[in-house]
Swiss-Prot record:
<keyword id="KW-0699">rRNA-binding</keyword>
<keyword id="KW-0963">Cytoplasm</keyword>
<feature type="domain" description="S1-like">
    <location>
        <begin position="1"/>
        <end position="72"/>
    </location>
</feature>
<keyword id="KW-0648">Protein biosynthesis</keyword>
<comment type="similarity">
    <text>Belongs to the IF-1 family.</text>
</comment>
<comment type="subunit">
    <text>Component of the 30S ribosomal translation pre-initiation complex which assembles on the 30S ribosome in the order IF-2 and IF-3, IF-1 and N-formylmethionyl-tRNA(fMet); mRNA recruitment can occur at any time during PIC assembly.</text>
</comment>
<dbReference type="InterPro" id="IPR012340">
    <property type="entry name" value="NA-bd_OB-fold"/>
</dbReference>
<dbReference type="InterPro" id="IPR006196">
    <property type="entry name" value="RNA-binding_domain_S1_IF1"/>
</dbReference>
<comment type="function">
    <text>One of the essential components for the initiation of protein synthesis. Stabilizes the binding of IF-2 and IF-3 on the 30S subunit to which N-formylmethionyl-tRNA(fMet) subsequently binds. Helps modulate mRNA selection, yielding the 30S pre-initiation complex (PIC). Upon addition of the 50S ribosomal subunit IF-1, IF-2 and IF-3 are released leaving the mature 70S translation initiation complex.</text>
</comment>
<dbReference type="InterPro" id="IPR003029">
    <property type="entry name" value="S1_domain"/>
</dbReference>
<dbReference type="InterPro" id="IPR004368">
    <property type="entry name" value="TIF_IF1"/>
</dbReference>
<keyword id="KW-0396">Initiation factor</keyword>
<dbReference type="GO" id="GO:0019843">
    <property type="term" value="F:rRNA binding"/>
</dbReference>
<dbReference type="Pfam" id="PF01176">
    <property type="entry name" value="eIF-1a"/>
</dbReference>
<dbReference type="GO" id="GO:0003743">
    <property type="term" value="F:translation initiation factor activity"/>
</dbReference>
<dbReference type="GO" id="GO:0005829">
    <property type="term" value="C:cytosol"/>
</dbReference>
<keyword id="KW-0694">RNA-binding</keyword>
Amino acid sequence: MAKEDCIEMQGTILETLPNTMFRVELENGHVVTAHISGKMRKNYIRILTGDKVTVEMTPYDLSKARIIFRAR
């Protein structure tokens, strides 16, 4: 899928789920399930509850997302 089709949003980690999945609350109040992108996994970026993250979502399934950045 092309990068232009993705929707980027800011959110906060609510809870950690098994298999590097996370429950993320977006700025607009929606709660989605997100997984870590491959580059973050490769570089061992640690994500904890309460972290501010940037997620990208596809327009086809708005209940799932990919975490692409963790704010400092």
